[in-house]
Amino acid sequence: MASTYTGLGTQLMTTGEKAGTWGTLTNTNWNISEQIAGGYTAQALSTTGATTLAVNDGTTGAALANRVIEFTAALAGNVTVTIPLDVETFYIIKNSCTNAYSVEFKYVTGSGGSVTWASGDTGTKIVYATANDATNPDIIDATTAFVTATSTTTLTNKTLTAPKIVDGGFIADGGGDENLVFGEVGTPVNE
């Protein structure tokens, strides 16, 4: 039985195969594993249309086999970035593209879920490629559940330990009728 390869290019050698070459092949596999575990790459995208992230089995350097990917390009239109159907991993992806166009990250074929950076969004997302279906796998945006500095997430029944509110900041009630305003000196005033 011949060697096979994982979706990210690691060679799975059959017992008894490749006599005398295991050292070299194993070292390459370890390098691929390190790249997958924590590698970073800046990936220049096509300025319009699609960019395909591919893997060369048994070799290092494939952009899609890095944990962190930064998309770069001066976009001239909406773009799509695709990965092969058998890739199952998670990524931290930063969209550093300029110009106000969207970037969609998806599997190469199928109608499964994808992740999109809206026009002008240069944020960072944690996404995972599920490979959960042979023809329509999903890519999921794990960051949609995060509370960030710019999000408008509603916190219900949460305890904030030692929150800091800026001078002139306020807490509004749900109906928008009253505010608790914080000033630099003195006590909070209920308005």
Label the model's feature ranges.
Residues 1-9, 14-103, 137, 159-191:
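Exposed extracellular interaction/assembly regions and N-terminal maturation sites
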Residues 18-19, 84-85, 120, 148, ...:
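A broadly tuned, weak detector of single residues within folded domains
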Residues 26, 144-150:
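Flexible coil/loop interruptions and hinge/linker segments embedded within long fibrous stalks
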Residues 79, 87-88, 101-146:
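Beta-strand-rich solenoidal segments
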